[in-house]
Amino acid sequence: MIEIITEADYKDRLAAMQNGVLLFFKKLCPHCKNMEKVLEKFGAAKPGIALYGIDIEENAAAAAALGAERPPTIFVIKGGEAKASKVGLMNPREMAAFFEKA
């Protein structure tokens, strides 16, 4: 399940995250909704990976700090750092490959 975080706690969450995914989304974005479903499937297949989401409109400073310009933007977090990012929709197989490659 994707846990929603905010600007107030995203830095602490990222710093503590060993393996995870951060999704910048917009509430009315259809591609974001689809990407949420992909991440839910991805998370079910890889239970040790943390899944976080952050609203890009309500948390613009966090988006700017990480370089997320438009939703959906996905960041792979390993060892507390963003190792890779991608904008747009992926299927579960692409998401798994993207995570492993980062």
Predicted regions and their residues:
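Short active-site neighborhood of thiol/selenol oxidoreductases, capturing the structured segment around
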Residues: 15-27
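Thiol-based oxidoreductase modules, predominantly thioredoxin-like and allied folds used
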Residues: 4-6, 24, 43, 47-61
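Non-catalytic, surface beta->alpha helical segment in thiol-disulfide oxidoreductase systems
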Residues: 75-102
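The canonical Cys-X-X-Cys-His
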Residues: 29-32, 74
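N-terminal "domain-start" segment that seeds a small globular fold
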Residues: 1-12
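Typically the conserved alpha-helix immediately C-terminal to a functionally engaged Cys/Sec
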Residues: 33-45
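CheY-like receiver
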Residues: 12-13, 62-66, 98
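Structural micro-motif
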Residues: 66-75
